Each structure stands twice: as C-alpha cells, then as structure tokens.
Curated annotation (Swiss-Prot):
Protein keywords: Acetylation, Aminopeptidase, Cytoplasm, Hydrolase, Manganese, Metal-binding, Metalloprotease, Protease
GO cellular component: cytosol
Cofactor: Mn(2+)
E.C. designation(s): 3.4.11.9
Function statement: Metalloaminopeptidase that catalyzes the removal of a penultimate prolyl residue from the N-termini of peptides, such as Arg-Pro-Pro. Contributes to the degradation of bradykinin.
Species annotation: Bos taurus
UniProt-annotated binding residues for Mn(2+) 2: D426, H489, E523, E537
Protein name, per record: Xaa-Pro aminopeptidase 1
Family statement drawn from the similarity comment of this UniProt entry: Belongs to the peptidase M24B family.
C-alpha cells in the first residue's frame, strides 16, 4: 500500500490559509475532521476531505495542518493503516497512548503567539468546538469559523453530493408510524417548554420518518435536516425524490392532513437561514433542543438563551430501544445472514486448500451469498477480510496492493455484515484452515473466554456498558494481553451499523445504561502485529432475566445472541475453558444447529447444512 504523496496538496492548502478571498485574516492552523455536516461516522465521497488531503481513509481521525506541520490523530483501530497510507509529511498521533498530546495541547505547543486556528463550522461538532476554543483561548490563541471549506477550494474534482431515491418502511418493519413517533416527541418537548427540536443526525431523521436512503455507502440514510415544532414539521431535503408517489403516500403529502402533521419540504442548504428566522420569534422562556454533536454552525444559529444542548437526543435514545417488530426483524435478518455465512465457510473449507482464494475473492463470495437472501439491500460496512499479518490491522479492508492469498498456515479473520430490509448484521469469525499453533489457540481461547463472559453476564437494570468492558478483557489481562478498541457498539435496525448511545467500552459513548430492547455487539479481540488478528463478534439483544433474588425490585438483564454462526472449535484450547464456558458454547452451538439448520433445510442448502452439523459438535474437556 503506497502512501499518498501530499506535498503539493499541503502547499495549496497552506496557500488557501493565507488567501483573503477565503479568510478575513490569515490563519496559522486548519482543522480537518472526519465527519460531514451531520457528524456521520461513514461519509459520502464528497465529504472525504481528510482522506483527500492526507491519504488516510479510516473512519475515524482528525487532521491538523499548520504552516510547518501536518498531524493526524486516530485511535488504535487505525494505527497500522494510517502509518501505511500517509507519507512523510504527516506525523501520526496515536490517541489513547500516554505520550500522545491532545489536539489542543499540540496546537498550543507548536503555534506562534496569538495564532488563529480555522475550521469549517458546518462540519465541526459543537462539543468539540467548545473544548478546543477554551484551551486555545487560555493560551492566547483564537478558534475561527471559516465559512468556505478550504479543502473544497483545492479539491478540483470533488464528487457531487448524492441524492438517491428513498425507501419507505411500513409498520411490519417499524412497529410504529412516523406520526406516532412525532406525537411521542412532542409530548417530551411540551414537558420541558421546548418549542423546536432541530434534528441533524441522518439516522435519526431516517428513523423518525420511517424512511431509508442510500446517499452514504452501506448506511441507509439520506442527506437532510428536520425541525420539529409543536405544530409544525420541516424537512430539508434536495432533489425530486420526495415527489416519488410511494414517498408522497408514505408521508401523506397529498392528503389534507391536520396542520400539525403536514410536512413542509424545504431546500437542504436552507437549514441555517430558516432556523434563524424561527429563533427570531421565540419568547423569552421558550427553548430549542439540539444535540451537542450538531455542527457549531447549526448550534450558533440558535441564540444561547434559547439553546438546550443534549448529549443524546430523545430520538437517539428511543431509536436504541428496539420494539417487538424491530427485534423480530433483527432476528430474521441474522438467520438469513447465518445461512450466507454457513455457505461461505463451507466454500472456504473446500477451496482454500486448492490455493487461489484471496482476501478480496473471499469478501466477494460473502457478498454473493448474502445477495441470495430475501430483502438484502447492501453490505453494512466494507468487509474486513484479512489473513495472517493483515488481520492485525483492526479495520483492514483488502485492496489489490495488499491482497493476500488464504492458506493452510495462517489465521483468517472476516468481519462482515449486511443491511436487510428487516435488520442490520455485523459478525466476526476467526478461523484456521490448517493446524493452528499452540500460541494462536491460546490467544483465541482468551478472546473466546471474554466473549462468553460478556454474553453470559447477568447484571442489574441500569448498568452502564463500561462496567461490562472488563469482563471481555479479564482473561487477556491475566496473561498481560489486551486490545485497542471497544468491546461493543450499538447496532441500528436497518440503519447504521454503529449507533449510540449504548455500547460496551471504556469510552464515553457507553455512558447510557443498558436496557431491555437495546442491541449491541460483543467483540473482544487480540492482535499480534505482523502475525495475526483474532476477533469473535456477535450481535446481542438486551433481555430481562429472572434471578433467584431481586434486590430493591430493580430487575436484572442479560444478552440473547442474535448472531447464530458457529465458532470454530479447532481454534480452542478446550482444556483451558471452565465447565460453564464449555456448557455455554455447546448450548450456543445447539441453538445455531436448531435455528439455522431449519432455515438451511428450508432453502435446500444441503452442503452448508452438513458443514453446520460438523461445526456444532459438542466439545468436552479431557477427564
């Protein structure tokens, strides 16, 4: 993987930083975040500014360019990838390591006195702005909003913003109509004297209106904003896609609806001007809800006295708790996904010994089998298909320059998922097609122990995800090992594969308590640089569980695995498992055999069924 040569781009960007057509005064540093105007994790090609200017295209990272330096902050998932993709103009800042300075501290250390630091206010989150501005101000510097995005000014062949057709979802999939969702939100608004709710996150808008799109690859969302009032609904969206008959019928646009459910459709880019008009007529005590992750530009359009910022919006929290229709849809999606993976792993077992199966061809085969399933829409993220040392790159995606052939001598890791109309999947399995070494089995077994510890955990209602994170790491920690990513993230229902506010991690997104109906992943791992990667990932549903006692009547919760794909027993040091762990795995495999076996039989996939039966044989420790 040859790094991108960035010398000329950086020269042009630094020139733009001094160009008075774009800035009122020259700026001494420019911040280029990962996200778009909606702070999305996965973004459209037209918003890949950080990747364009640096070459690093991982989903998380922030670039900062000064007159003399170019630095990139990213987390442990991307250390190896970023190092390979960036040239010598860039300094990699490894977030989470004790010697790595924060972005603001680094700026203070390298900038001349009284510097101006610029950023596009439409793509910087409000919470980030506040933190950065405070530190810079205390050191005598200034954070400046730069209205014209400077990367756009030097990006001559920047792609157009997508504007693709919309998908409507009926009650069979959503369980609740968009009108009822609006009514529920208005009740919450009225309780708090909130008259307007500005919705900026793309998945929140899609969920609210029971619509999906395909403007961002693998994420069924569409570019839009929404403003919800107590008697008004405004949807900011471009193109004629809103005029499609099926969409007009779904949103009841042609019906003489009561005024409070009539949707006003406005141009996408008019959000700031319309918001300022609405705020101009607010009475003194009236409030406007907005996420603190909304862009600084949107937040600043609301007068400070009226602005009510929230870390998680009511939509974010409601969306995370799946209703029965959504939970059932997720179960159906995971059954179909397991069928596809049984087909894939059966195919790999036959083909890998012959030679010629590569990381890319294996990923393509996984997609081929998924496409055969009903209601398949797209993958849910680019498939991580990695063998040998590539497996140690946590978010590796194979490209022709790095494409390795699967062999009988290396560990193979595949992390993949799909968007079905009834649900979103995300599953990782690690396997060996020959004979794993004792060390590979040892590491795999530590990871499996952590996976089981989380999946089998029983915990009080109100427990936050970070309290479960150590369950996944305990066996690794006992041996002095660890991994540099969270243990689990929320998963959308035919929505983004990563969603808040719940998760299992030492990081801040796991601040919201887990509750019944939430769906998260359980994915501990271990990565040996230059050798292999191991990860075992299931999507799990939070469910109530009965316990012997019920302290303070608070109730208890546990997890139901939705992913039903065998875990390769060849990779396990069975004698290192406890009896409880053996029982858990045997029970899990029995469920895989019963549930997925029936579906394989129904679909006439006999070879894959035979593979499933072989892979779900009970394990037992040596007496």
């Amino acid at each position: 993987m040859a790094p991108k040569i960035t010398s000329e781009l950086l020269r042009q960007l630094r020139q733009a930083m001094r160009n008075l057509e774009y800035v009122t005064e020259p700026i001494q540093a420019y911040i280029i975040p990962s996200g778009d105007a909606h702070q999305s994790e996965y973004i459209a090609p037209c918003d890949c500014r950080r990747a364009f200017v640096s070459g690093f295209d991982g989903s998380a990272g922030t670039a900062i360019v000064t007159e003399e330096h170019a630095a990139m902050w990213t987390d442990g998932r991307y250390f190896l990838q970023a190092a390979k993709q960036m040239d010598s103009n860039w300094t990699l800042m490894k977030m989470g390591l004790k010697d790595t300075p924060t972005q603001e501290d680094w700026l203070v250390s390298v900038l001349p006195e009284g510097s101006r630091v610029g950023v596009d206010p439409l793509i910087i989150p409000t919470d980030y702005w506040k933190k950065m501005a405070k530190v810079l101000r205390s050191a005598g510097h200034h954070l400046i909003p730069v209205k014209d995005n400077l990367v756009d000014k030097i990006w001559t062949d920047r792609p157009e913003r997508p504007c693709k057709p919309l998908i409507t979802l009926g009650l069979d999939y959503t369980g609740i109509s968009w009108k009822d969702k609006v009514a529920d939100l208005r009740l919450k608004m009225a309780e708090r004297n909130v008259v307007w709710f500005v919705v900026t996150a793309l998945d929140e808008i899609a969920w609210l209106f029971n619509l999906r799109g395909s403007d961002v690859e693998h994420n069924p969302v569409f570019f839009s904003y929404a403003i919800l009032g107590l008697e008004t609904i405004m949807l900011f969206i471009d193109g004629d896609r809103i005029d499609a008959p099926i969409v007009k019928e779904h949103l009841l646009l042609d019906l003489g609806l009561e005024a409070e459910y009539r949707i006003q459709v406005l141009p996408y880019k008019s959000i700031l001007s319309e918001l300022k008009i609405l705020c101009a007529s607010l009475s003194p005590r009236e409030k406007v809800w907005v996420s603190d992750k909304a862009s600084y530009a949107v937040s600043e359009a609301i007068p400070k006295d009226h602005r009510c910022c929230m870390p998680y919006t009511p939509i974010c929290i409601a969306k995370a708790v799946k209703n029965s229709a959504e939970s059932e849809g997720m179960r159906r999606a995971h059954i179909k996904d397991a069928v596809a993976l049984c087909e894939l792993f059966n195919w790999l077992e036959k083909e890998v010994p012959k030679g010629g199966v590569t990381e890319i061809s294996a990923a393509n085969k996984a997609e081929e089998f998924r496409r055969q399933q009903a209601d398949f829409v797209d993958l849910s993220f680019p498939t991580i298909s990695s063998t040998g040392p590539n497996g140690a790159i946590i978010h590796y995606a194979p490209v022709p320059e790095t494409n390795r052939t699967l062999s009988l001598d290396e560990v193979y890791l595949i992390d993949s998922g799909a968007q079905y109309k009834d649900g979103t999947t995300d599953v990782t399995r690690t396997m060996h097609f020959g004979t794993p070494t004792a060390y590979e089995k040892e590491c795999f077994t530590y990871v499996l122990k952590g996976h089981i510890a989380v999946s089998a955990a029983v915990f009080p209602t109100g427990t936050k995800g970070h309290l479960l994170d150590s369950f996944a790491r305990s066996a690794l920690w006992d041996s002095g090992l660890d991994y540099l990513h969270g243990t689990g993230h929320g998963v959308g229902s035919f929505l983004n594969v990563h969603e808040g506010p719940c998760g299992i991690s030492y990081k801040t997104f796991s601040d919201e308590p887990l509750e019944a109906g939430m769906i998260v992943t359980d994915e501990p791992g271990y990565y040996e640089d230059g050798a292999f990667g191991i990860r075992i990932e299931n999507v799990v549903l939070v469910v109530p569980v009965k316990t012997k006692y019920n302290f303070n009547n608070r109730g208890s919760l546990t997890f139901e695995p939705l992913t039903l794909v065998p875990i390769q027993t060849k990779m396990i040091d069975v004698d290192s498992l406890t009896d409880k762990e053996c029982d858990w795995l045997n029970s899990y495999h029995l469920t895989c055999r019963d549930v997925i076996g029936k579906e394989l039989q129904k679909q006439g996939r006999q070879e894959a069924l035979e593979w499933l039966i072989r892979e779900t044989q009970p394990i037992s420790k040596q007496p």
